[in-house]
Amino acid sequence: MQIILLDKVANLGSLGDQVNVKSGYARNYLIPQGKAVSATKKNIEFFEARRAELEAKLAETLAAAEARAAKITALGSVTISSKAGDEGKLFGSIGTRDIADAVTAAGVEICKSEVRLPNGVLRTTGDHEVHFQVHSDVFAELNVIIVAE
């Protein structure tokens, strides 16, 4: 099925690309999410008329994401306290939700799906580097300090 992308889609293309995808992927995911329209003559003409508007909207979201990434980086570090044993091993773990809540409490709005933990959940006290993906092209890093209660 031929579609026109209205947004950047990972492993598929960016705004304005005409791509061929399986019809189920287009009908059940891309079109309902507003990320694509089917490539009919009418839709192609309509898209070309609105292309500048859509590109401006995409640039605006990218600028907002870069501003959020700068705020995250400006925080420097976030401290989370958790119950731990004598050797610094936590009772339980610190996951994406805990980190997102701590960063949000520090003043930057983050949802848990934007937190990237490459080595899995945090299970020890100390300093840990955490990555955030606030946009498909924008990343940020933050130092999370876990202290024992």
From Swiss-Prot:
**What is one Gene Ontology biological process annotated in the Swiss-Prot or TrEMBL record?**
translation
The record ties this protein, via InterPro entries, to:
Ribosomal_bL9 (IPR000244), Ribosomal_bL9/RNase_H1_N (IPR009027), Ribosomal_bL9_bac/chp (IPR020594), Ribosomal_bL9_C (IPR020069), Ribosomal_bL9_C_sf (IPR036791), Ribosomal_bL9_N (IPR020070), Ribosomal_bL9_N_sf (IPR036935)
GO CC: one term? ribosome
Q: Gene3D superfamilies recorded for this chain?
A: Ribosomal protein L9, C-terminal domain, Ribosomal protein L9, N-terminal domain
- Protein family per UniProt: Belongs to the bacterial ribosomal protein bL9 family.
Specify the protein name. Answer: Large ribosomal subunit protein bL9
The record lists the organism as Proteus mirabilis (strain HI4320)
Disulfide bonds, paired cysteine numbers? none
* Function comment: Binds to the 23S rRNA.
- List the Pfam families hit by this protein, alphabetically: Ribosomal_L9_C, Ribosomal_L9_N
Q: Which UniProt keywords apply?
A: Ribonucleoprotein, Ribosomal protein, RNA-binding, rRNA-binding
Domain of life, per the record?
Bacteria
Q: Which GO terms describe its molecular function?
A: rRNA binding; structural constituent of ribosome
